Amino acid sequence: MAAVVAKREGPPFISEAAVRGNAAVLDYCRTSVSALSGATAGILGLTGLYGFIFYLLASILLSLLLILKARRRWNKYFKSRRPLFTGGLIGGLFTYVLFWTFLYGMVHVY
C-alpha cells in the first residue's frame, strides 16, 4: 500500500523568535513613520481633524508598502495579516501627537 502524505499549506515551521523579531521590526517601522509624519504635520501647520487624517493616511500608506514588500509571502513572516495593518497603531499615535505638537509649537508658535 502506498502511503498518502497530505501537504500542508504555509510554512512547515514557525520560529517564535523570528515572529517576535518581525514584530519588533514592524513596531520600529511604525514608530519611525509616526515620528516623521508627526514632524511633517507640525511643520505644515496641520491642526485638529486634518492632523489626525494625516496620521491615518500615513499609517495606511505604511501598511500598503509593507503588503507590497511581503507580497504573497506574508505568511512566511507573520502568523496573520492583521499585524501589518494594526500592529503598533496606538503607540504610533502617541509618537505622532508628540512630534506633531512639538514641531507645531517650535515652528508656528515661537
Swiss-Prot record:
Segments in the Cytoplasmic topological domain: 2-28, 72-89
Keyword flag Lipid metabolism: no
Topological domain ranges for the Lumenal compartment: 45-50, 107-110
Cellular component per GO, a single term: EMC complex
Keywords: Acetylation, Endoplasmic reticulum, Membrane, Transmembrane, Transmembrane helix
InterPro entries: Emc6 (IPR008504), EMC6-like (IPR029008)
Subcellular location: Endoplasmic reticulum membrane
Modification type N-acetylalanine: residues: 2
Pfam families: EMC6 (PF07019)
Protein name per the record: ER membrane protein complex subunit 6
